[in-house]
Amino acid sequence: MTPHSTHVTLDHEGIIQPPAEFKERSKSKPNLADFETYSKMYKESIENPSKFFGEQALEHLSWDRPFDEARYPVSSEQDFADGDIASWFVNGQLNASYNAVDRWAIKNPNKPAIIYEADEENEGRIITYGQLLKDVCKLAQCLTKLGIRKGDSVAVYLPMIPEALVTLLAIVRIGAVHSVVFAGFSSSSLKDRILDASSKIVITTDESKRGGKTIETKKIVDDALKNCPDVTNVLLFKRTGNAHIPFTEGRDLWWHEEMAKYGPYFPPVPVNSEDPLFLLYTSGSTGKPKGIQHSTAGYLLGAAMTSKYTFDVHEDDVLFTAGDVGWITGHTYVVYGPLLCGATTVVFEGTPAHPNYSRYWEIVDKYQVTQFYVAPTALRLLKRAGTKYIENYKLDSLRVLGSVGEPIAAEIWHWYNDNIGRRKCHIVDTYWQTESGSHMLAPLAGITPTKPGSASLPCFGIDAKILDPVSGKELKENDVEGVLCVKSCWPSISRGIYNDYARFIETYLKPYPNHYFSGDGAARDVDGFYWILGRVDDVVNVSGHRLSTAEIEAALILHESVAECAVVGYADELTGQAVAAYVSLKSNVSEDLEVIKKELILTVRKEIGPFATPKTILLVDDLPKTRSGKIMRRILRKVLAGEEDQLGDISTLSNPGVVAQIIDVVKATRK
């Protein structure tokens, strides 16, 4: 063991090979033949990125004007050296909308592009590629008529309905830039993002539906626009048809009325490879919003390649990503990735628990979903509900099960594998970021061996390095722990923070010179598999021991009574920091709570060691989470620090009411 070794890599299960049934369930030949093919391609993507990605770009994308060279500079030796990011597909021109829609509409106009499952059961519709093209073209004409031109920003505040996809594709069809704001953000957060992106138009709905509840979407927009004088129009889709929705004459326009004015075709506007495609503001940040900017060609290639290789997507597949278009997962694996591959994408408006815990599995069987992609948070919820909600479903169309958003605990991995995959699907635990645009670490479906809890191996072009967090020295051997960085540029990397490139350099390129800094701790085990240990600011330093919160959480969840947990650090006079564990128990627990606390401490001592023992265990009803499923550890830290008045905007939480209960629990421990 090296001085930087990590306990999380002590995997007792060994390497799990892809199931033999994976290939049997596929209607098409797998996109990669074997692991040797991946290894050869990966090596070339690192050693000769210009040649590798040049060939991939010609294979996966249609070009209006061919690029002169795939990468400038051709060599990656000086990447990130002076805050510079390589340019990709120099002098090439293309259009994202054409690549995602037109070429498939021409080939097979009657093929389903979007399957829409509404919040209400048995409501929804199927949109073919031919119909999608018509809708996109009509909206593109509408936006042009309203004065939107190439490079302009359009704010999108829409729920998970097909019109969200139509909107994004129409915006990029005319060379404009979409800035999607998750339709759960408060009016204040929406206002900040509209102002920062200088958006001229907002596209939204009268109301939205989620989990059986009606959300007053338009009222939130109206409140935000009180302080956005440069917004000229609001385009309003009629989702519920509430006749009492506020409507501002001269500014507000009805979607259906505007769409009826235009014909079924509008030519796509070619843009340069490096022209911006979209802005997406990262969630959970404090202070000024951080608008991550992505380029057109590089992002599209990343979305297409990772969909094809990570998920083994083919044109005859149906991909169900249980994510929202307001986050990067929705952008890449609900919208662009599946459509760039000519597949069918499922757009689900609801929640996994409405009207009951069978909703996901009902959708899978109903539409013969082949790839399912979801956050571990949802899986924990469904595991707690019990297998009775799964037993009546075949789920035999599935061949790939994806996990996204946070590391998946081994216990949840096995539950997923046994109950949803029936041990016949390949589980791909993916690691990536808003800033990366597409997968960074992930198994490739049907190809890569896996270990429960590990993100496996780097994707093409990701020259992953683990650095010593203090010295910045690369830890080249296996069985090491440090910070995860990337040595060279890849096509889908963010091109910066909108209007603040200096902040981009400070955040991602300056901490470890000549590297992109992910912000995450990671380990590479004895077999070369990568494990994500959580954000570096989620690492707790107790008496000189650097403890990964993810590692402690993985130990706690082994206890049979634990449904969810989150570990954070807090100030301690003796040890510098101490470990606090917020624990949510399963609903059927009858055991004495003090006994459970003692058992949890023993579990951590057994799995990791005495130095990792939580000093405080707080039993709470639930944990604060965003709608995308991420646990908001920032809130948990602030409550522990007695900073309840500095929590910021909690309106984006899926369960904001839980914060008050958590505050009460913490206060009770101080008495």
From Swiss-Prot:
One of its GO terms (biological process) is acetyl-CoA biosynthetic process from acetate. Gene3D superfamilies: 3.30.300.30, N-terminal domain of ligase-like. ATP binds at G405, E406, P407, D429, T430, Y431, W432, Q433, T434, D520, R535, R546. Keywords: ATP-binding, Ligase, Nucleotide-binding. CoA binds at R210, G211, G212, K213, T329, S543, R605. Its EC number is 6.2.1.1. One of its GO terms (molecular function) is ATP binding. CDD domains: ACS. It catalyses: acetate + ATP + CoA = acetyl-CoA + AMP + diphosphate. GO terms for cellular component: cytosol. Belongs to the ATP-dependent AMP-binding enzyme family. NCBIfam families: Ac_CoA_lig_AcsA (TIGR02188), PRK00174.1 (NF001208). This is Acetyl-coenzyme A synthetase 1. The lineage of its organism: Eukaryota, Fungi, Dikarya, Ascomycota, Saccharomycotina.
